[in-house]
Amino acid sequence: MTPFMTEDFLLDTEFARRLYHDYAKDQPIFDYHCHLPPQQIAEDYRFKNLYDIWLKGDHYKWRAMRTNGVAERLCTGDASDREKFDAWAATVPHTIGNPLYHWTHLELRRPFGITGKLLSPSTADEIWNECNELLAQDNFSARGIMQQMNVKMVGTTDDPIDSLEHHAEIAKDGSFTIKVLPSWRPDKAFNIEQATFNDYMAKLGEVSDTDIRRFADLQTALTKRLDHFAAHGCKVSDHALDVVMFAEANEAELDSILARRLAGEPLSEHEVAQFKTAVLVFLGAEYARRGWVQQYHIGALRNNNLRQFKLLGPDVGFDSINDRPMAEELSKLLSKQNEENLLPKTILYCLNPRDNEVLGTMIGNFQGEGMPGKMQFGSGWWFNDQKDGMERQMTQLAQLGLLSRFVGMLTDSRSFLSYTRHEYFRRILCQMIGRWVEAGEAPADINLLGEMVKNICFNNARDYFAIELN
């Protein structure tokens, strides 16, 4: 019987253990996509307690707690921090088989150093007190934890109208060497069908000093904000493409669509597709000219529980996997961006694992001469961000493309404790390659495979995003 979560956790061959301990474990972290609040990094925020750093805002945990019958007041409601933590501690023993069980105990191990102890109601007091004592120390501040975890770069997720003042403040502080850069997330300028679109256009027009009436005005406003982001070191964009659409339109049609929407008129699905296509093609060309990377997160079905959406708002754990077809529209969109050789470096993520092979083959259609891995099939995302999801994604990438050119893991998280997801990924990667070696499917060449592992863990992302590190 193998003990739970030793230093050789998941490393079930000698070759995997060598790969992880000698090549993967000590690689720095390049976390190119996350949802950390830049204000907390700028202020070097001190966490009040374990709830504040661990459960607050974590919709993964809330979903598990709800499934365990926990009342909403103990998830997102007005219960005390300790009551919410106790509700989570009572849920954890029921999460065996869910990645939350592994994540929870990895996060207690690093950075808190808690090993040999499982979170449950009987250990809740001890773990709460021990972690809170550590959180009072300087090296457990927001920046302190990032430094402990050997982070070199994080890419936050930011709206085009954001001032980026916190990024500027961080950049000016020469004592803090981790790069904290904005990522451009223009969903609100793109989702013309949303009720909030007109209000957002007014805000975008104000910050860009542009009167947005025609499509060219929107392009001008977005270009000004792209320049603003570039001035703050941005090299990455991110788009939530819940449904991939494609329909072409001329400028007069786009002007009419935008004008009618700004006048409060409803649009047809075809008109929505025309507008979204034009925005994505325009932005893709801008990214290509600037050397940016674009990310497409495809296939979420959001806000399914309308009653809870009205009570609690979005992003609180009521989203799931969509099953809309996407291959044909995605192909047309990428091909259109590529017509003038203005398809930027692109990472494609799918939420439905059914679509893994769709993306794994799609990226091969648009690779770039002289640019290894220009088109990437992104790491297992959201509901696929677990052991078999990551194994599936990497196995299919290896079979359909080049795993050796993969840019690797990202946290996609709102928590400063989620850096252990990189450790989890690295262990799974080494386990997978070790099994290939054990089965005679890959050579037992530790230098060849060790270098490949180092590249996937850090070097490929550093080179791909072309961000100068301190």
Curated annotation (Swiss-Prot):
One of its GO terms (molecular function) is glucuronate isomerase activity. The keyword Coiled coil does not apply. Its EC number is 5.3.1.12. Keywords: Isomerase. It catalyses: D-glucuronate = D-fructuronate; aldehydo-D-galacturonate = keto-D-tagaturonate. It is an enzyme of class 5 (isomerase). GO terms for biological process: D-galacturonate catabolic process; D-glucuronate catabolic process. Pathway: Carbohydrate metabolism; pentose and glucuronate interconversion. Gene3D superfamilies: Metal-dependent hydrolases, uronate isomerase, domain 2, chain A. Pfam families: UxaC. Belongs to the metallo-dependent hydrolases superfamily. Uronate isomerase family. HAMAP family: UxaC. This is Uronate isomerase.
